[in-house]
Amino acid sequence: MKRLIHYIREFLFPPKCILCRGLLKGEESDICHRCRTETDEYPQGKLKLQFVDRVAAVWYYKGNVRLSLHRFKFRQGSFLAEPYGKLMAMKALREDLTEVEMITWVPISPIRKLIRGYDQDELLARVISRELGIPCGRLLKKIRHNRPQSGISGYARRRANVLGVYQALSPEEIAGRRILLVDDILTTGATVSECARVLLTAGAEEVNCVVVASAHHNNP
């Protein structure tokens, strides 16, 4: 019966590539062959951020990756957390980011979560937690509703926009621990750096980070 339901579901809702939305063929899973060959993976060890020990991104933030992440965040694309999270877990393993005791995420404001219906970074973090077998918890809270970073240009302005926006929760779960911080998109890195600073101030031993995609260029 379960197999029959599976076939009916695939007939009515054929699986599509998470990047280009084209129909998947044969043994293709999540990403079509064309997107796998044409989408640039982000190189290992290229990202450097203040307050963060190591950072890894699955892809460059451009083309179909950019469009797909826009669906994820703004067009009820919460289902994309599953394939994204699995890819992020594999990336974290390949880049040795998994020697941590806790996984957490960059939180959105309560207002934005209410409007969107979900916190996309929390969904990613929980998939990564399940895949890696590492506990996941809410260690940060957004205490001020600031301007969206996407509407601000320049690292200095973005950095100023996030100062004092985040607060550490449960210091006893943070102190002395190595933490993997999860975010969806990295541009200048200002938000991730501020979240890492807050975690370190609360006593974290080390903060690593993994993101779906990055448009980041290292800042001096």
Q: Residue spans of the language-model regions?
A:
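Glycine-rich phosphate/pyrophosphate-handling loop used in enzymes and phosphotransfer proteins
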Residues: 1-183, 187-220
